[in-house]
Amino acid sequence: TSRIRLGIAVTVPRVQHPLHIAARMATLDIWSKGRVDLGIGRSGYPYQMSAFGVDLANATEMVDEALEIIPRAWTEGEFSYNGKFFNIPAREVHPKPVQTPHPPMWLGCSREETFRKAGELGMGCLAMSASGPDRVTQLIKTYREGIGVANPVGKLIKDRVSISTLAICGENRKNIQERGAAILDWYRSQQAL
């Protein structure tokens, strides 16, 4: 194929260093001839992070720092960074991506404030929703308000929303509803931890 885009939804700076993310995504961008999008987020599921022996206490702040680092790694020569979580001595990161100024970036969103934040940062919005159309409409409106005042974290604005949802197929409506309710309960319990 020559047109399908490739993406990560989402990579988590709490368990991957931003320079590794930048270099790996640039490599994939080269291999795919400029068809990569980067999804980044904090992870909403503590069970995922417990496998790495980390918690989500500072995950949002780490994402914020990574969002400062990754576009710089892609677009600048030598740079340095001194943050609360990541300290990078002066260096140039290679390879550089094919896409200019850099691959589009998406933010993993699960709450209204992250939809707004994605827009304000000029990032695409990646979300999963078990909500109805009215709630999704409100979340998209919130994103659009953010895009309206965007100060891009990188050097471009990705004005897109991608929302996936669960679908369960089967022959018995009652069993499907019970299974769907159990799955939704599980997802909600993970976000609440």
Where do the PLM segments sit?
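Active-site-adjacent structural elements that line small-molecule/cofactor binding pockets in enzymes
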Residues: T1-L193
